[in-house]
Amino acid sequence: MADTIAQFEHVISICRDLFVKKLKDYGASWRIMRPQSVTDQIFIKAKRIRSIETKGESKIDEGVRSELIGIVNYGIIGLIQLHLGYSDSEDITVERALDLYDKYMTETKELMYAKNHDYDEAWRSMRISSYTDLILTKICRTKQIENNNGKTLVSEGVDANYICLLYTSPSPRDGATSRMPSSA
């Protein structure tokens, strides 16, 4: 389990590093996005991953790695947007955005480590393509919950699905780690 934690921390640092760089380039321009738009951005990235897996090639010089990082970072953005609501302007500082990023990533990590313990790292035996299918399933669920104005009868809400997308996306499993860049 210690190796798993170190591997997850490495992947998380890659995602955060890119988030920081894009935050410096673009500011918190994503603050104008409504949660439904964030969900659609994640959907686009997951569909591209499935397309690359199915076709076995990509015509754009960005592979699966960048899409997985995007899913993680948009998942965090989604959690921030659910917490703060969307805005008509970039209404938070870089520091505040990073504080919120770290807060939601920490909450997600704690849940991920608990689930990893309970499931005894069963995810390490999963096929890579199953991750993509799980991500797409979570997105479909999220869209349905959004279409129902966030109301569910027995299921968790949009926030729980965003969190699940975060720990389903880039895993340190052999083969999956190679999908992540060694540097951002």
Predicted regions and their residues:
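Conserved small/polar residues in nucleotide/adenosyl-binding loops
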Residues: Y167-D174
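Intrinsic disorder/low-complexity detector
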Residues: M1-M33, L82-I128
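Short conserved catalytic/interaction loops centered on acidic-Pro-aromatic/His motifs
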Residues: Q81-E90, N147-V158, R173
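Short, contiguous, well-structured surface segments enriched in hydrophobic/aromatic residues
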Residues: R16-I60, V64, W123-V154, V158
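Hydrophobic alpha-helical segments, chiefly the membrane-spanning helices
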Residues: M180-A184
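Charged, amphipathic alpha-helical oligomerization/scaffolding segments
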Residues: I14, Q41, G70, L100-K103, ...
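Hydrophobic, ordered structural segments
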Residues: G63-L84
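Short, compact, well-ordered microdomains
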Residues: E62, S66-I69, A160-N161, L166
